[in-house]
């Protein structure tokens, strides 16, 4: 009960920014006497701070105001992409503290080389947090690959040519501070969490069911059903890149033919747009940036390639909507940048438009059914931060351990 009440107060202050004890009591139902004990404890833990005064109830004399603090503790996201390692930290209030990047050169089939880069960058980043006198609270490693097991391991990465790799175990062995204080997550799963949260703020009501699809170096995604992320029995649930869209179609890295990734993934679109040579010379990331630029300038071949990819994307969205019946489908990665050029219908259904048997629309018109992501390339890290902060704040008094 005590932890519940502490969390109740923290959550209330986070949502209402500057507030007073009487307002907290009114919203939470906690007695003022309880708050007299709870609030000093949360101030001591660095979660709340007193900030001057606010108008008293019914215009009475000013009273001390409270705000969420969280500036003493950092959460750190280490994201491995197809071309670089990114380490970013924020405090518990979500304020960015530092961001560092380093290319890893995409050494195919050599996880040790990527891990070397990640360790060097992470140690540099943690040393800088020490210099800033901000305590390391929790780390989240973000990986664009299916994960399985408990603790999770990388099952495989077609982008990097990895097989099964105990990425978390190797990082903890070389950075002891991560022991017991680090999570390994799939990039698209945490991006789905972040995009859902961003849309909730935008539309003003909860989103409990959402499908997120993204493409940059491959195709990934995440599904939220009844407020919970779909991970499956083995942790590899919802890998949309390998949904079959064309029997006997183009060969896929998974050894099948006609997978979503093979038919409408980056390499397929780049080849269709005449940018395969650039991808081979400069890498997929640079080629995708060129694709986006050409689309924005109206290049006919690029627009045709994106239109064909959009047809496949729309088919997959329809199939996934039949399976999950989400409130919305969000397209992230480069798809968000070229959303209009994909020509995907924003309101889908089965049957003729005039007599649809099933239609996916939002009756309150607060948002279209299919829409572009809001968070760009930072979506996965934003989701990682949300996950880490929520976990730390679920045990508010434990944060006293981080205060000297």
For each feature predicted by the language model, list its residue ranges:
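ATP-binding/phosphotransfer module of carbohydrate and carboxylate kinases, centering on a glycine-rich
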Residues: 1-103, 107-127, 200-204, 260-404
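Glycine-rich phosphate-binding loop plus the immediately following alpha-helix
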Residues: 180, 184, 188, 245-280
């Amino acid at each position: 009960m005590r932890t519940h009440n502490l969390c109740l107060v923290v959550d209330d202050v986070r949502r209402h920014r500057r507030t007073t004890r009487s307002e907290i009591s009114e919203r939470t139902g906690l007695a003022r006497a309880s708050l007299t004990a709870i609030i000093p404890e949360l101030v001591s833990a660095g979660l709340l701070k007193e900030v001057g005064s606010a108008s008293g109830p019914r215009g009475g004399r000013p009273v001390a105001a409270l705000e969420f603090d969280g500036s003493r503790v950092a959460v750190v996201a280490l994201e491995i992409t197809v071309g670089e390692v990114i380490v970013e930290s924020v405090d518990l209030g979500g304020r960015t503290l530092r961001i560092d990047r380093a290319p890893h050169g995409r050494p195919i089939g050599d996880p040790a080389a990527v891990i070397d880069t990640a360790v060097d960058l992470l140690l540099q980043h943690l040393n800088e947090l020490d210099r800033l006198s901000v305590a390391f609270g929790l780390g989240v490693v973000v990986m664009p690959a299916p994960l399985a097991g408990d603790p999770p391991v990388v099952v495989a990465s077609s982008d990097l040519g990895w097989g099964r790799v105990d990425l978390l175990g190797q990082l903890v062995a070389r950075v002891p501070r991560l022991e017991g204080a680090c999570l390994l997550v799939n990039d698209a799963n945490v991006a789905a969490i972040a995009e859902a949260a961003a849309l909730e703020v935008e539309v003003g009501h909860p989103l409990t069911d959402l499908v997120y699809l993204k493409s940059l170096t491959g195709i990934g995604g995440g599904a939220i059903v009844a407020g919970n992320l779909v991970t499956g029995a083995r942790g590899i649930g919802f890998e949309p890149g390998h949904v079959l869209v064309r029997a006997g179609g183009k060969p896929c890295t998974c050894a099948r033919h006609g997978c979503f990734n093979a038919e409408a993934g980056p390499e397929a679109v780049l080849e269709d747009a005449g940018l395969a040579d650039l991808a081979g010379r400069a890498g997929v990331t640079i080629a995708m940036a060129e694709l986006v630029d050409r689309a924005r300038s109206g290049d006919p071949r690029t627009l045709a390639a994106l239109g064909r990819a959009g047809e496949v994307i729309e088919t997959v969205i329809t199939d996934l909507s039949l399976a999950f019946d989400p409130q919305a489908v969000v397209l992230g990665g480069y798809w968000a940048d070229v959303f209009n050029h994909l020509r995907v219908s924003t309101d889908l259904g089965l049957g003729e438009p005039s007599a649809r048997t099933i239609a996916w629309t939002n009756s309150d018109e607060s948002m279209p059914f299919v829409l572009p992501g809001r968070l760009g390339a930072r979506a996965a890290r934003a989701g990682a931060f949300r996950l880490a902060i929520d976990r730390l704040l679920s045990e508010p008094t434990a944060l006293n351990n981080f205060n000297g």
